[in-house]
Every structure is written in structure tokens, then in C-alpha cells.
């Protein structure tokens, strides 16, 4: 199972230009609101028509502007689940799921498939309920069942947990993970939640301003996001523009720190460090900083450190016990070279 996408769509003030490929895996499109993630899924599903390009799923050409191919949404067999699930409000659970099985001409096979998927998702006892009578989790399971009963070529999940309360998300995330495993084909997951993406996806495409900003396995993207946007979306809150001093040293201008770094790639414009990667310490890579604030989190402290009066404060996260024992007005910290993220403004070429 695979997907290939290379499309462009001009919306006037916004231009979508997406190019990526994925195999039999879960690929997450990680980006901020309005970055083009959901629009990409709509183009794949046939709801929005690109201006140019090509979309292929499992060697079936869904769209090709040069060859004038543009299959209907029904012909594409893409299983798109919207953020709000888009259940028919005046139809029961059973009727909603039957609507998804409409392509099967044999009535007995169609009813057997509906019964099987309802049993699989624990919906049999809710067959006569309307969507308004269901919990958020039951609505999600109904939407997934309606999609899967149609035997789609690919599963497209658009912010599948955004409509759920926090206390429901983790449990339902486990159910979706199992659904993905059972599906066994290509899955595209749209999200702005880095933790959700890391738990569910195999690979990550960072999306910014309608285009791919970074691409790789989830480990690659989190350990080396490569761009400012990639670093921010994967949770790095300490980012500073730099001045390159020599082959192994840069000046973090916002932080007023000279940092030792690994080999510096071309076009690097900024440096970042995750809050939990800062270390207490002494020596040539240490900086004496003034504590200018502390934030108590449920299970940790974030301490704001300033290397000079004019510098931007850097956030350092540590467990509560450490800070309660070592709380002080000034402290020496290290920025380990191996923990520093060397960042470009954007990627000139995205790996596919």
C-alpha cells in the first residue's frame, strides 16, 4: 500500500504546494492551524480539486492534471474522517454505517459487513441510537466504522481527537491505534499535537504555510527537526538566531551566549535547545545565569534563566524535587553540544 502526492492549489492569499510519498505506514501531517494539513486531505479525497499535479494511491491514479484524470470521491475509495465526524444527524448508528457500505451490490454481503464492523467497534447495542444520543467516543467509533465498512484504499484522519474532552482522548487514542494496526494500509493523520503524533505515527511531515517544511521518521524529526518551524511544532521553546563564529562555535544572539556546536550545516540561521536538555554544571560550556522566574507545572518546574540583563530568558525544566533542593538566585548551567538543534529557516528540498 502506498500514496504519492505532488499537487498545487492557489487560493489567492494562500498557496498549497505539497509533495510527499508514504508506504504502508502512518504518516502524520504536523502543523499549526491554517498551514494546509486538512486541505491536503480534502485534495486527496476529491473534495477539493488541485490546480495541477498528481495523486496516486496503490497504483491507482486519483488525479492527474496533465492527463485530465479526476476521479470522483466515491471512485477514489478514500476513508476521510472529519474533525466533527460528519455523522448524519437524523440517521441511527446502523443507518449511518449502512450508508458507508453502499458500494457493495450484494445485500447479504453488505449487511454482514455492517454487522461485523458494528460488533468490532462495540456498537451493536447502540444500533438504534441517533448521533445526538451518543458520547463523543461513541460518535468517533461510529464514524470510523462507517469509513472502514467501505473497505477504503487509504485512511485519512483529520484531527480525530479535537472534538473530545481531555479525559477521553487517551483511551480513544488506544482504540484508534488498534484500528490503524488492524487496517494494515497507509494512514494519513492530521494533527497539531506533537505528543499525539509521536505516539501514533511512524513518519512525520512538518507542514508550514502550505508546504512541506521537514520530513522523516518520527525519531529523526524530533531529534533533528532541521527548521525553526519543525523545532517549534515538536515542542522546542528555546530558539535564538545565531551568528556563526567559526566551524564549531556560534553566538546565540537572543540568549547572549557563545555555544560550542557540532559541525555547522550550510544555511543554519538559528539554534534551539529543548528545556529538559539543559544541564546543571561547570566548566567551559557552562553559563552563570540569573533566575528571573519560575513556573510550577503539575510534576516539574520551569525555571527562566538570563545570562545577561539584556538577554532573552531561557527555559529550563527539571523535576520538582531537584529545584526544591537546589533553588537559588544564580545557577550555572550547561548547553550540551549534542543537545543543540541547528536550524534553517526552511528546507530547500524535502526527502521523500
What are these regions (language model features)?
Residues 54-76:
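ABC ATPase NBD Q-loop/coupling interface
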Amino acid at each position: 500500500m502506498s500514496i504519492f502526492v505532488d499537487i498545487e492549489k492557489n487560493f489567492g492569499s494562500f498557496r498549497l504546494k505539497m509533495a510527499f510519498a508514504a508506504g504502508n505506514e502512518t504518516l502524520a501531517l504536523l502543523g499549526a492551524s491554517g498551514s494546509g494539513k486538512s486541505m491536503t486531505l480534502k485534495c486527496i479525497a476529491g473534495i477539493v480539486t488541485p490546480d495541477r499535479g498528481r495523486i496516486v494511491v496503490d497504483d491507482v491514479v486519483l488525479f492527474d492534471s496533465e492527463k485530465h484524470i479526476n476521479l470522483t470521491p466515491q471512485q477514489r475509495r478514500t476513508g476521510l474522517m472529519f474533525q466533527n465526524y460528519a455523522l448524519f444527524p437524523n440517521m441511527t448508528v446502523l443507518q449511518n454505517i449502512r450508508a458507508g457500505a453502499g458500494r457493495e451490490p450484494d445485500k447479504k454481503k453488505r449487511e454482514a459487513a455492517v454487522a461485523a464492523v458494528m460488533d468490532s467497534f462495540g456498537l451493536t447495542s447502540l444500533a438504534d441510537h441517533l448521533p445526538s444520543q451518543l458520547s463523543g467516543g461513541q460518535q468517533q467509533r461510529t464514524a470510523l466504522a462507517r469509513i472502514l465498512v467501505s473497505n477504503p484504499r487509504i485512511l485519512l484522519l483529520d484531527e480525530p481527537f479535537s472534538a473530545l474532552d481531555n479525559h477521553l482522548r487517551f483511551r480513544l487514542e488506544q482504540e484508534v491505534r488498534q484500528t490503524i494496526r488492524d487496517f494494515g494500509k497507509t494512514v494519513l493523520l492530521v494533527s497539531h499535537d506533537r505528543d499525539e503524533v509521536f505516539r501514533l505515527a511512524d513518519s512525520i511531515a512538518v507542514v508550514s504555510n502550505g508546504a512541506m517544511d521537514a520530513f522523516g521518521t518520527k525519531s529523526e524529526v524530533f531529534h533533528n527537526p532541521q527548521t525553526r518551524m519543525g523545532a517549534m511544532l515538536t515542542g522546542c521553546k528555546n530558539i535564538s538566531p545565531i551568528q556563526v563564529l567559526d566551524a564549531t562555535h556560534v553566538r546565540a544572539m537572543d540568549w547572549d551566549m557563545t555555544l560550542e556546536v557540532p559541525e555547522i550545516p550550510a544555511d543554519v540561521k538559528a539554534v534551539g535547545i529543548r528545556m529538559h536538555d539543559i544541564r546543571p554544571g561547570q566548566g567551559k560550556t557552562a553559563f552563570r545565569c540569573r533566575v528571573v522566574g519560575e513556573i510550577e507545572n503539575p510534576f516539574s518546574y520551569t525555571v527562566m534563566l538570563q545570562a545577561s540583563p539584556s538577554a532573552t530568558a531561557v527555559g529550563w525544566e527539571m523535576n520538582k524535587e531537584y529545584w526544591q533542593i537546589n533553588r537559588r538566585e544564580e545557577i550555572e548551567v550547561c548547553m550540551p553540544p549534542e543537545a543543540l538543534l541547528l536550524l534553517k529557516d526552511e528546507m530547500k528540498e524535502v526527502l521523500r
